[in-house]
Swiss-Prot record:
Bound cofactor: record note: Binds 1 FMN per subunit.
Gene behind this protein: azoR1
Name of the protein in question: FMN-dependent NADH:quinone oxidoreductase 1
Highest taxon, organism lineage: Bacteria
Function in brief: Quinone reductase that provides resistance to thiol-specific stress caused by electrophilic quinones. Also exhibits azoreductase activity. Catalyzes the reductive cleavage of the azo bond in aromatic azo compounds to the corresponding amines.
Amino acid sequence: MNILQIDSSVLGGHSVSRNLTASVVADLVAANPGAKVTVRDLDQDAPAHLSGHLLPVLGGPKDGLNAAQEAELQRTETWLAEFLAADVLVVGVPQYNFSIPSQLKSWIDRIAQAGRTFKYTENGPVGLAGGKRVIVVSSRGGVRQDANELDLHEKTVDVVFRFLGITDITYVRAHGLAMGPDAREAGLSSARTEIAALNDGGRLAA
């Protein structure tokens, strides 16, 4: 089993999502001895945001790239290879101003490539990255207005992964983290319970 852990929080060791992604991955490894883990820290190694300078890197002929673009091409190919090789992705997705961290969006811009992870057909786009499992660790200071609906940052990653052909998506939520000590502990406790349920149900085993 190849496990890709994606961390995008800017809070380092104080990050709830980072601590929880590490916990999920530890349980995955315990349930799947010999699993290979790749950790991609999008804060410490942040992808550059999409720009005109990057367009030649992400599509079209690769001849004529300058040195900076060649370096970005190699980084992009590394991230794309990690994504394609992963059987399970554990993705830390904190909510920043109603959306996902910009560095996570930049990573998505690198791996969502026509002809590589999806394709266009006469009947619409088709994902090419199916067969993977995604565990999204969702964290936020507040709480969802509707417990039956995905939150805004969750909807973003859900749409992206489904567009790429991935339908096995599970959410671990630590919400209410900025609403006082009791709400914070309740959010953390809920997330721990959800992680334990993944393990109890045998969902962490290959």
